[in-house]
Every structure is written in structure tokens, then in C-alpha cells.
Amino acid sequence: VNLAKEIDADLVMASDPDADRVGIACKDDKGEWVLINGNQTCMMYLYYILTQYKQLGKIKGNEFCVKTIVTTELIKKIADKNNIEMLDCYTGFKWIAREIRLSEGKKKYIGGGEESYGFLAEDFVRDKDAVSACCLIAEVAAWAKDNGKSLYQLLLDIYVEYGFSKEFTVNVVKPGKSGAEEIKAMMENFRANPPKELGGSKVILSKDYKTLKQTDDKGNVTAIDMPEPSNVLQYFTEDGSKVSVRPSGTEPKIKFYMEVQGEMG
């Protein structure tokens, strides 16, 4: 970012050492550099791809996108408004790759991603790929600039058209054997006593991916169509908020993914 300031760049892109994730930064409307999170990047990818597909007449009705269940629901809104199917899968790009494989010869995959900075456009790679992602975000930035906008202004346009979304994650660390037992007890308590309200808004749908059952606010129970059980709980509220809870698979912590939505004028 310091170098970007020196040369008055429009965009900063950085990948991790194995080049599967990419983070970006751009200037806001005051000229200050801001970091763009994984959800926001995925929004801009999808918005751009669908805009180009529509302009080129490439939407044939069999296209689909994929997101993980903890990724923002605003991405689904973008897909829905453009009549593109959006599939949900578990955290981890192997699940996105699975959906691509299952749809080979039937549907066309045109993009997908997860909130943890992993993205994939087209299907010639079957894992998150920072190289193609960097190429695509540079193309998005150039397209925005050709239309007299910055990436930041493009993001604001998306919020105005589809609604505002704010996401954040809280990690609660519980080390050792006692910590693992405490995390297990927390998940069991959430299952036994699911919240009725979150942030003052009524919970209208609870999903338990361990039992593969979902319950609405009227008590109706239906099945969740996923390939296997997973220790994840999700709560959706009347005002469009979403809270996802799951233990980490690699570290002694429990993770809370939170999303709130609203309107921008």
C-alpha cells in the first residue's frame, strides 16, 4: 500500500505464498486506501461476470455459480436478480469443485468463491486460484475505470442496487482438552436451545447441518440437501441477518460468522 501511494496506483493485489488466495486494496471516495474483504471481492467478481455475460448474450439458462454457506447472501441476491442459479456448499474449495464436477455436461459454471479470499472463475482450475483471480480483478478495475468509476465506487453501486451487507467473524479460542469439551458443549447448547431472536430480529429459519434438518419459525422441519453432515449451525432472521456457528477443523476455537443487511440510498 505504501508503494501504491507513492506511484498513485488504482489497485493493490497480494496473494499468499501458494497463490490460492488474493487480497485487494483500493482508494475510497476520499482517496484513502481501504482493504476490500473476501465477500466484497466476490460481489464485484460476480457482478462483473454477469454484466459481461448479459451484454454478450452468453446467458443461455443453464449457468450456475457456487458459494460456501458462510459467504454473504448478497451474492445470491445478485445471481437471483440475473436469473442465475446459486448453489451453496460447505466451507472449503473441494466442495465448490465437487459441484462443478457433478454438473459437467449439464450446466455451465461461471464463477464462485468463499469469504476467506478464495475465488474461481470458469472451470479450467478446480481449486481457488489467485493467478486467475488477480487477472479478473484487474479486468474489473479497468472496466470500472473505463466507465469513470473506481473499484470502490463500483462496490457502492452494487450496494445501492442489491442492498448493503456487512460481514464479520468472531473467533473464540478454547485451548486444550477442556477447551475442546467446552466447544462441544457450546454446540450442544445451541442445538438444544436455538435462539428465537438475534439483534432484536426474529429468527425465521434455523439450519443444523449435522442432522441435515432445517426448522422454520412455524416449527416446520424439512431436509437440507447436502452431501454429508457437518457440525455447523445457521440462523436466519426476519431482517435478513445470518449467523453461522462452527468449530474450527484445525485450531482450538469456535467460529461465529455474522452478516447483517440493509438498504443504501
For each feature predicted by the language model, list its residue ranges.
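Catalytic or ion-translocation cores adjacent to nucleophile or general acid/base/metal-coordination motifs
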Residues: 36-51
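Short gly/pro/ser/thr-enriched loop/turn and capping motifs at secondary-structure boundaries
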Residues: 21, 42-44, 93-97
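A generic beta-sheet turn/junction motif
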Residues: 17, 249-251
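N-terminal small/polar loop signature for handling phosphorylated ligands or for N-terminal nucleophile
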Residues: 1-21
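Short Gly/Thr/Asp-enriched flexible loops that form oxyanion-binding sites at enzyme active sites
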Residues: 20-38
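Phosphate-binding and adjacent anionic-ligand microenvironments
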Residues: 5, 9-11, 32-34, 52-246, ...
